[in-house]
């Protein structure tokens, strides 16, 4: 969701719209190779659940860059879902979903901050941003990985 990070992988990325669905909710339980939890959409469990995100278009030639960075085929798969674009109305988008989850995992502080920064940058509702901020996160002890990822933060 953080444009700077996405553009480092897919320079052609152009924002289409902020999107919402009541069919899914945000979790940070995708098993990552760095032993933390990464963001994932999970089936909604209650009527108050919702998932916001940002739809981007990218050149087809860059799709493999994004697939590699996201771990497609290694804990993430792709699917198409119907969402409601805030300004454009109904949209059909493809997204990644986790196939290897562990509900005990927590995101690293820097990862959660990237998620919050991306939500703010793209104008997601403040009450939704507060929900993201409420997720517990943990310290990453790998200082090189922290430095590499904090460069995307504002």
Regions found by a protein language model. Give the residues of each.
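Glycine-aromatic micro-motifs
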Residues: 1-154
């Amino acid at each position: 969701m953080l444009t700077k990070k996405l553009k480092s992988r897919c320079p052609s990325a152009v924002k289409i719209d902020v999107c919402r669905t009541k069919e899914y909710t945000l979790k940070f339980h995708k098993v990552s190779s760095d032993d933390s939890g990464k963001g994932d959409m999970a089936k909604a469990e209650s009527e108050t659940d919702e998932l916001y995100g940002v739809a981007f278009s990218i050149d087809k030639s860059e799709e493999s860059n994004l697939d590699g960075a996201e771990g497609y085929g290694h804990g993430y798969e792709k699917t198409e879902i119907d969402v409601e674009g805030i300004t454009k109305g109904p949209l059909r988008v493809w997204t990644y979903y986790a196939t290897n989850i562990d509900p005990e995992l927590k995101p690293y502080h820097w990862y959660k901050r990237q998620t919050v920064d991306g939500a703010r940058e793209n104008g997601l509702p403040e009450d939704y941003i507060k929900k993201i901020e409420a997720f517990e996160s943990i310290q990453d002890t790998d200082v090189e990985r922290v430095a590499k990822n904090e460069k995307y933060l504002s």
